[in-house]
Amino acid sequence: MILGFVEVSHESLALAEAEAVCGAEALGGGGVAAGVPIPGLVAVEVPDRDALTQLAGRLALARRCLVPIPAEGDVVVAAGGEGASGGSASFRRLGRPSGGGADEAVLASGRAFKRAGGSIDLERPDRRFWLARGNEGREYLLEQVAAIDRVAVAQRRMPLLPFQRPVSLPPRLARAAVNLGRVTPKDRVLDPFLGTGALLAEAGLLGGRLYGIDRDPAMVRGALQNLSFLGVAADELLVGDSREVEFGERSVRFSALVTDTPYGRSSSTGGEAVLELISRVLERWSDRLTDNGRVVVVVPSGLSPGALPGTPRFRVPVRVHRSLTREFCLYEKAGLTRSSC
């Protein structure tokens, strides 16, 4: 295992940090409680650098994945040591826009790298180094392993899809929810409130096998349009009541249930209160989860602690749209019981 860092970036840092840790868990690693105390970074443990690159390909609420360079308290000396192997590099301050004025530690690190035999290239460097100041004032030298492709995520925004509804989760938040579910290739993923298919689309892009249910035939047709547009195929999408319908493969078990519960005037619950509907649906499908299965459910904000069944591992309010806040709740199968939250 190696130590890595994720630079998170979202107004809900709690959700961004949880996404990074759960994403690392999906790759055989996890979070590190005693990480380097650098603001804006989450410490994770992954099998190797390739896994850190894979993590960058999974995440949506982050900027980059990095590894620490041993500095023994002097980042300039460490930068010189890296320059001895040649090649080009860039040096910047983490969390500070380029062109923000002179930074002596950054400049000195670049000079040391160059003196040792390397060269400086700010446009297309072979390696990208970042300096970061910890909470205790100590300087750290980090090397970027991979950057998050935020443009690709933005290209999946609702206005760019063929089937559109104003209340659908933005792709960044949908991807974060799927990462909380630790979805990996070939995992079967269920969304019992399919909607526009935003959650299943993100699960499919991570290689998951997709199953969805919605009582509105128009939503199922629209979700199929969106999935096809994004190059994602579903195993089975059903029209009907999530408490009653059954998939063709009756014994199918799911690694993750990930859903955004109905809300807004355009959503249909068949006249049932949303909280009661959620509880009944989770009760119906929880025994179809694999032993280490997870449930990620996005619910109306402001619920009382006992409003949902089970004990969540993680629960945080997140602003989804300008005037709409929802709560992201993560359950392990073992914690999805009738005890109060």
Predicted segments, located by residue:
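Class I S-adenosyl-L-methionine-dependent methyltransferase catalytic core
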Residues: 1-67, 115, 124-341
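N-terminal auxiliary segments of SAM/dcSAM-dependent transferases
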Residues: 13, 20, 72-140
